[in-house]
């Protein structure tokens, strides 16, 4: 198991390119199951979750070709089975996204209940209730969702009980080949939902309203193949901007959609950053100043994403002043707090709130990642800690960040990846000399 070793205290400076969005490419890969012709996808991030989704499609019979630029051709014309095994689904919650397209195109699906990050209850009730409203028969048997439909799914008016990104995406895909019109109320508005709709529309779907809380899908008989480029990852972009702010640096991120970063940029400006925006870039300069503490309340888009909560917590623990972070999207998403406290952070938890008093510096320590975004927060904290910070269980971070140590090193950070057996050997050697 790999670890990251970080020597803190270096301001980040320079320019990096932002990768394609993990939360956009996964539903779009699942959506290729709706299409009988080859699809070429570009701007694909090299991530463990993407590899898992590709393997899942491959086991179903999809023919997949990857070139040296990480463009992917997916041909789902010869799908042989509609079974998504527990072995793969347990590692990634987004695997549930194959349910809608399998059911819509093939009239049946067997999908294991998902796994993924341990950050609270994220039930699939919205997915199942929506599929049933579209005419599917669904049973839960031995940890699997067994879904069937006679003929085609039928369009319906759906009122989602809670805002859910994957639930909205799954129901969009299910409705794309359904008979008649489907209207989704209380739909998620995230840019990744819009990207899925844009992709499907380019392949021949008839979807309107994506980006609002009411999405209308007029079902079509079939989709055609084509090519599509995945939108940039706003969470990766936000992570590097926060890293620059908390290290008092000056960083430009390229190949981004600044309009998707509104809430993040607003808080970074409030923290004292000078922010400039271009068509596809953002420039952040702290001019050597310490960041000011900022209150954060997570909420669905266009408000502050819950996936940026841990990063802003890392900023606040070394910022000037006090801040309150309120988590409204997921329960149990403060598991990184105890690890930050090991580094000297002054954080007190009160239910869904974290009360933070900023310190000038943290102290490096061994810490353990508990989920994808928590691991990013710990890496950022390590950038401002005295001495060495060792982040363990970084397989979490590899699920959502492409080459994070290389990009941070490109900006001047002292960071390296080592395998556990190499680290253990070095630690043992050091002890012999003590």
Curated annotation (Swiss-Prot):
It catalyses: phosphoenolpyruvate + UDP-N-acetyl-alpha-D-glucosamine = UDP-N-acetyl-3-O-(1-carboxyvinyl)-alpha-D-glucosamine + phosphate. InterPro entries: Enolpyruvate_Tfrase_dom (IPR001986), Enolpyruvate_Tfrase_sf (IPR036968), MurA_subfamily (IPR050068), RNA3'P_cycl/enolpyr_Trfase_a/b (IPR013792), UDP_GlcNAc_COvinyl_MurA (IPR005750). The keyword Protein biosynthesis does not apply. One of its GO terms (molecular function) is UDP-N-acetylglucosamine 1-carboxyvinyltransferase activity. It is an enzyme of class 2 (transferase). It is found in: Cytoplasm. The lineage of its organism: Bacteria, Pseudomonadati, Pseudomonadota, Gammaproteobacteria, Legionellales. The gene is murA. This is UDP-N-acetylglucosamine 1-carboxyvinyltransferase. HAMAP family: MurA. It comes from Coxiella burnetii (strain RSA 493 / Nine Mile phase I).
